[in-house]
Design a protein with these regions (language model features):
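Extracellular loop and loop/strand-boundary signature of outer-membrane beta-barrel proteins
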Residues: 14-19, 75-81, 94, 135-142, ...
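C-terminal beta-signal and adjacent terminal beta-strands/loops
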Residues: 449-517
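Outer-membrane beta-barrel signature, preferentially recognizing the C-terminal barrel domain
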Residues: 195-201, 247, 276-328, 347-359, ...
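Face-selective signature of the C-terminal outer-membrane beta-barrel domain
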Residues: 28-30, 34-52, 80-235, 261, ...
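Surface-exposed extracellular loop regions of Gram-negative outer-membrane beta-barrel proteins
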Residues: 229-234, 264-310, 324-344, 463-476
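Outer membrane beta-barrel strand-and-loop segments of large Gram-negative receptors
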Residues: 149-153, 194, 203, 304, ...
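C-terminal beta-barrel architecture of Gram-negative outer-membrane proteins
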Residues: 383-385, 401-449, 461-464, 472-476
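Outer-membrane beta-barrel translocator domains and adjoining extracellular loop/strand segments
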Residues: 1-12, 56-74, 118-126, 132-133, ...
Length: 517
């Protein structure tokens, strides 16, 4: 992939281009086991392992200007990831007890282990405007991450009749993250950048949900009570006394939905939900990852969860559905690029304020003929990002449009043609940046044999190579334009054969902690 930026910082221009080559491979294996001890009870066991490993290289050249036209020097940097490895073990045990149609009890225990390590060698070489060597530095970084996630869930479902259903449950989870980061410059340990970071998180939740149907009216209401405690300790090589931080809070998260069937073809519904989104563990690690000496990424151990409130009014008529929505994020966090001094930039995930969104979405899906399935989606949105953090306060807002179309066409000889496209207009990004228009077009052919167990498919994604992530923005003394293009245009040939039972009736449990890895 290739990416780069042009920035104007305190009146000076920086032009940077990077070629990123990722040579990692993914390996995975898993096993599922089901045992029905009695007609009313079942035991499910799942275990899997996933390994992502291999080298990688980035080559970056940054031109440094005095003002906007006079070239002052060139910085050439190379990130040589001589080792990259992430290993994830997931284990789950589920017991399901269903003595009758009215009662069901489910108990689930989960343990996930995540091990990540990398070794990166990075020479940074400075040249003059006439390409004469000025100086050279050699950086070395070695992050090691160990994360354990333990969770226990219990759900009880009671259905006294066909019109009513109760669901109540409890969940507890514990996360332990131990991280070390070694950073060297020219063979000597940088005691300001090298550190160890410990993070512990405990969660206790209790929840209940009631659903009742009364003729054409359906009502569902729920409440979740969550207690969260976090503690972290950051120890730098240069300090004997670590920096400690802890936080605890107790919060309520209600949800409510009311729907009414106007007739057999149409229905109207109103939905409200409140939830919290917790930061990724990677974003909490205060490690520094250098693109070069002028630009780098850094974690933030002081991130707080963001709180989401969302209201949706929906209408369904035959194959058409319309949704009018409003959402607000408080303590909103996202990755943001800030100026560091007068010559550097740092990208960090921060709680930057609030985000509001109003949206109108339309979805149409229908089998137009016995051989043609068609669906289309159109969304109109208005984003408002209210940045209010540290000493910066500003508001960014912009409308946008998102369109997508999908076709599935049955051809002679049992072939199936799939053609889909997507377009996203210019829109507001996560903070102050504006994303330029982008889109893609995909096409694929497939055929199935042996009672649909054997499948052969040929797919080409992003035919015109237009699925890019280019943006621009302004914040204080920083004007930033960035571009990003990945290997989105691919030709993929897949051959698959399904063995054994096609449907595994396991009770799925929601473990949001895993989504933060």
């Amino acid at each position: 992939m290739d990416y780069g930026y042009e920035r104007l910082q305190d009146g000076n221009k920086y032009l940077s281009e990077t070629v990123d080559t990722d040579m990692r491979n993914t390996y995975s294996a898993g096993i599922d086991f089901s045992w029905q001890a009695t007609p009313t009870s079942k035991l499910f066991v799942n275990s899997s392992v996933n390994l992502l490993a291999g080298p990688g290289v980035t080559a970056t050249e940054t031109q440094v200007y005095q003002g906007t036209t006079t070239l002052d020097g060139i910085l050439r940097a190379r990130n040589d990831y001589v080792e990259q490895k992430t290993l994830r073990y997931s284990n789950s045990l589920n017991y399901l007890y269903r003595p009758s149609e009215k009662h069901q009890l489910s108990i689930t225990a989960d343990w996930t282990r995540f091990d990540g390590t990398a070794r990166c060698e990075q020479p940074n070489t400075y040249y003059s405007a006439t390409n004469m060597l000025v100086r050279s530095d050699f950086f070395y970084s070695q992050p090691d991450k160990d994360i354990d996630i333990y969770a226990l869930l219990a759900d009880y479902k009671y259905k006294p009749n066909d019109e009513s259903e109760w669901l109540t449950g409890a969940k507890t989870s514990f996360i332990r993250s131990h991280n070390t980061f070694l950073f060297e410059k020219n063979g000597a340990i940088d005691t300001q950048r090298s550190n160890t970071f410990h993070y512990d998180e405990g969660n206790i939740e209790g929840y209940t949900q009631y659903t009742h149907t009364l003729g054409k009216l359906e009502l569902s209401a729920g409440l979740r009570l969550e207690y969260m405690h976090t503690s972290s300790k950051l120890n730098a090589y240069s300090s004997q006394d670590g920096e400690e931080h802890s936080d605890s809070h107790l919060r309520l998260f209600p949800n409510l939905s009311i729907s009414y069937a106007l007739n057999e073809q149409s229905k109207v519904a109103l939905l409200y939900s409140r939830r919290q989104d917790k930061p990724r563990y990677e974003d909490l690690n205060p490690f520094e990852y250098l693109l070069d000496e002028l630009s780098y990424w850094k974690g933030n151990p002081f991130l707080k969860p963001q709180i989401s409130n969302k209201l949706i009014l929906s209408y369904v008529w035959n194959s058409l559905s319309l949704n009018l929505s409003y959402s607000k994020l408080d303590d909103y966090f996202t990755s943001i690029t800030d100026a560091l001094g007068t010559t550097k930039t740092v990208m960090t995930t921060k709680n930057i304020g609030a985000q509001q969104q109003v949206g109108l979405e339309g979805l149409f899906s229908k089998r137009l003929t016995p051989w043609w399935d068609f669906s289309a989606n159109l969304g109109l949105y208005y984003f408002v990002n209210k940045l209010d953090y540290e000493t910066y306060k500003e508001e960014y807002k912009r409308p946008s449009c998102l369109m997508s179309v999908s076709n599935s066409i049955l051809l002679p000889l049992g072939l199936n043609l799939e053609l889909s496209g997507r377009y996203h207009s210019k829109h507001q990004g996560g903070s102050y940046e504006v994303i330029r228009p982008n889109g893609s077009l995909d096409i694929g052919l497939s055929r199935m044999w042996a009672d649909d167990r054997l499948r052969l498919s040929l797919l080409m994604t992003d035919i015109f190579h237009t699925d890019r992530w280019d943006n621009y923005g302004h914040k204080g003394a920083l004007d930033l334009t960035t571009w990003f293009g990945s290997e989105s245009r691919k030709v993929i040939l897949r051959l698959s054969y399904s063995l054994g039972k096609q449907k595994f009736n396991k009770v799925e449990s929601s473990l949001g902690e895993l989504d933060r890895l």
